[in-house]
């Protein structure tokens, strides 16, 4: 897993395979961190967008 900044209020999570991406997206969808605005899944990534930069650490913990 690799975390890449994506602007002031988002982080892109890169995963090794589709299975990992599905599990992460499901978990984040069922138990979103406070301030999560959007989750954008792709082939092996999930973009996590939050309301404020202060909320990023909780979103990726």
PLM regions and their residue ranges:
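Conserved "landmark" site that anchors the functional core of diverse proteins
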Residues: 1-61
């Amino acid at each position: 897993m690799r975390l890449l900044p994506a602007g002031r209020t988002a982080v892109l999570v890169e995963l090794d395979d589709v299975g990992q991406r599905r599990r992460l997206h499901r978990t984040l969808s069922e138990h979103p961190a406070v301030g999560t605005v959007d989750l954008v899944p792709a082939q092996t990534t999930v973009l996590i967008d939050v309301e404020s930069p202060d909320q990023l650490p909780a979103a990726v913990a």
